[in-house]
Every structure is written in structure tokens, then in C-alpha cells.
Amino acid sequence: MSVASLPLRALNIATQGANILGTLLIVGLVVIICTDVLGRNLFDAPLSGVPEMISLSIVAIVFLQVPQALRAGRLTRSDGLIDSLHRSRPRLASGMELLFDLLGCLVVSAIIYAHWPILIKSITRNEFVGAVGNFTMPTWPAKLMILIGATLLALQFIARIIQRLKKGHIQ
């Protein structure tokens, strides 16, 4: 293994770890929702805070899992145009792929830049969701997961850009 591939390997391991964490959150939500449904129907006692937990977790799950989707080439997109361009005009298609990665990195970087103060405010003000005395949950863990996922996504875009330029697809 070359020294140059170590950062990419570390990025891919971190990306896979975030994906696994997102999957574990999904499993946790399934357990919580099933427990809530059983509690409502069998004991007329719903589980407190389920809507709050779900609303915070869904966004965190998306941000934790989208870097792996990009890495695996499974990010949702329309391939019809780009596939036909790869056959007829490969340089143009490669340029469009590079442009997609650059714009993706730019947009995700803007999200990171805008989200950082939101995370800091959430931590310093001890923000929470729910009703005091019934159920409260801090918001910062979900916001931290969003920041981690967005950072991994930006780094995956950068890795794709570097790989495209190394392969010489753009001349």
C-alpha cells in the first residue's frame, strides 16, 4: 500500500463507519417505533418523545449515509445523458462529471460552513426538543452527526476530483 493511498483508505473507513452508524440508528428507530406502537395498543401508554427522536434521527441518518452512497456510485442521478455522452463525447462527459463533483463539494462545503455555528449554539445553549417534565432530548448529537456526514461527503467529493485528475480524464 502506498503512502498516498493511506488518507483515501482512512476516509473510506470513516465513511463506512458513518454508514454503519446510520444503519444502527435505523434499527434503533424501528425498535423505538415498534415499542411505541405496542405500548399504545396493548397498554394505552405511548412511549414519550418518539416523534422528536424520529425527526432528529432522520436527517442525521441521511447525512451519515450519503457519503457511502457517493463513494459506491449509488448517489441518485439520471445517467441517460451522461452515459450517451461517455459513448459519443467522452471528454465532455468527463468534464461534466468533474463539474458535478466540484459543485457538489462547493454546496456541501457551504452546508458545513453554515452548520458549524448552529452546532456550537446548540451545545452552548443546551438546546433540546420535547417538553420539560415529559421528555427532553438534546439536539447537539444529531447536529454533530450532520456535520460529520457533511464533512465526509465533502471529502469524498474531493477524493473523486483527485482521482479523476490523476486518471487524466480531463485534458
Question: Where in the sequence are the language-model features?
Answer:
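Alpha-helical transmembrane segments and membrane-interface helix-loop junctions
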Residues: 1-171
